[in-house]
Swiss-Prot record:
GO terms for biological process: rRNA base methylation; tRNA methylation. Keywords: 4Fe-4S, Cytoplasm, Disulfide bond, Iron, Iron-sulfur, Metal-binding, Methyltransferase, rRNA processing, S-adenosyl-L-methionine, Transferase, tRNA processing. SUPFAM superfamilies: Radical SAM enzymes (SSF102114). PROSITE patterns: RADICAL_SAM. The active site is at E120 (proton acceptor), C378 (s-methylcysteine intermediate). Reaction proceeds by a ping-pong mechanism involving intermediate methylation of a conserved cysteine residue. The keyword Nucleotidyltransferase does not apply. S-adenosyl-L-methionine binds at G200, E201, S232, S254, L255, H256, N335. Its main location: cytoplasm. GO terms for cellular component: cytoplasm. This is Dual-specificity RNA methyltransferase RlmN.
Amino acid sequence: MSSAVVVSSENLDGQQQSSSTPASPAAEKVNLLGMSRAELEKFFEDIGEKKFRAGQVMKWIHQYFVTDFAEMTNISGKLRAKLEQICEIKAPEVVHRHYSKDGTRKWVFRVGEGSGSLVETVLIPAEDKTGSRKTLCISSQVGCALDCSFCSTGKQGFQRDLTPDEIIGQLWMANYSYMEEVPVAERERSVTNVVMMGMGEPLLNYDAVLSSMHIMLDDFAYGMSKRRVTLSTSGVVPKIDQLAKDIDVALAISLHAPNDELRNELVPINKKYPLAQLIAACQRYIAKDGNESARKHVTIEYVMLEGVNDQPEHAQQLLKLLKNLPSKINLIPFNPFPHAPYGRSSRNRIISFQKTLSDAGFVCTIRQTRGDDIDAACGQLVGQVADRTRRAEQWQKKVAQRQEILRTQG
């Protein structure tokens, strides 16, 4: 019996609105949660207030996790009343909260109008040389359009991009979950690291993701170190170049194959941006003027698929591919999902693969699988608490049809 703790909202199918949707047109309010400092400064000037109020309000929202303007005690009563009339601070609705026996936490959020769509966020705790680390894996889209063959999220299809308040709301809620019983004056930020590795391709929702990361780095909000915010991409090359100009954060590449033929199968966007272009973009990202610690290397993510990309020749090809790219390699044991066409590489195979890379001088780690008891491990970010999306159902039907054809041919 699983020891995960599941806390559900009272009405799974209720009509509570998300952060980006007002209760009614007449009651429409401006949601301040996803606004950057520059946006908040303009907002306050537009309503006839001094722009320094932006920093004050940001601190109350993102450092003390306050949603009631009446609690913002360093702001005049008149301004608080004004904000109450025209503004709100509203994160996406939490449908379920899952707490794993290993400390992993997962939130299922409802976003969009009416019953909306579901997205998931996972927090993974760990101990390192700096102490207790809490890494939050944030989603950027509802579903994903890239359809990587080993990823369960992609099999849901793509529905829409998340808004900045829906993205930053995931970080807000994760922090608040540790502080909700703590007096406001004693609250502190708990999440130490953010990885944009959840549902969706972050670089295909570029503006909203960029705005959200600026809030993460802002000292008036979460004040996170640039090296503690990581964006993971499957390889949208033009946007990698744009990212290098717009913000300094750590970059991770969902590589998963050491040659174009195999990567075309596993990560279809490779057909548009093949490996030579992707590696060159990574080199440009690292070499960008103004390089700081966040850009000293690129993290390479490599899911280990039994008999597919885990053979000795694949390790040798990977060494050749990465020889001129400062990188750290993270080997990820595959997490099977229903109808998945792959299996997980054996532990011995993964260790052997790691040894080949380490012996060649690369820093190579094996990701510890966490949160399996709550379907929170990487590749399992699917909405299992509600009906499958229409596209997921269609995909399952196609799988069944293919299996039937194979049986009849056999």
